[in-house]
Amino acid sequence: MESEKDFLSDIFYYLPPRIRAFFLKLPPNICDEITEIRLRADKPVSIVTRNGCAFITSGGRMSFICSDNLPVITGSEISDMVTKMCGYSVYSHQSDLVNGFITLKGGCRVGICGTAVIQNGAVTAIRELTSVNIRVAREIKGCSDDISDLSLIHI
């Protein structure tokens, strides 16, 4: 079975190299539990796991305590990352971006926050990106077995 860390490497590819290095140091059991990666400009890098929200240390560990020595991501790194997620063609993803998200290969959804550009009452673009929230898509085998068994009873 492919490990979660291998699956996550597709997501890690989009992270700035400096931030990616911290994630690559994480133990596999931590990677197995990541459901979201939260990146906010000039704030510590955080993840969401089954145990709640935690921060990533520069040593590749998890910390439940926010401190000044945690790695932060810059606004410029967030902009570069979104550009990479858009295949270096932000314009071709503009309709997704104005809806606040893009979808990566493999089904991971990436929420995008920034300043909305509004024309005639409609959001037409997003600029000055401030945060990215990567929701990790996972296959959970058998999760609907009980439901599908019930639906067969009523046929």
Question: Over which residues does each language-model region extend?
Answer:
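Beta-strand/loop-dominated core regions that host nucleotide or nucleotide-derived cofactor-binding catalytic loops
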Residues: 85, 119-120, 124
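A short beta-strand signature within small-molecule sensing/ligand-binding domains used
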Residues: 111-112
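N-terminal pre-Walker A segment at the start of P-loop NTPase domains
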Residues: 126-147
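Conserved small/polar residues in nucleotide/adenosyl-binding loops
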Residues: 153-155
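N-terminal accessory targeting/assembly segments
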Residues: 1-106
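Short, acidic Gly/Pro/Ser/Thr-rich loop/turn segments
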Residues: 44-46, 119-120, 141
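Short, charged beta->alpha transition segments
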Residues: 97-100, 142-151
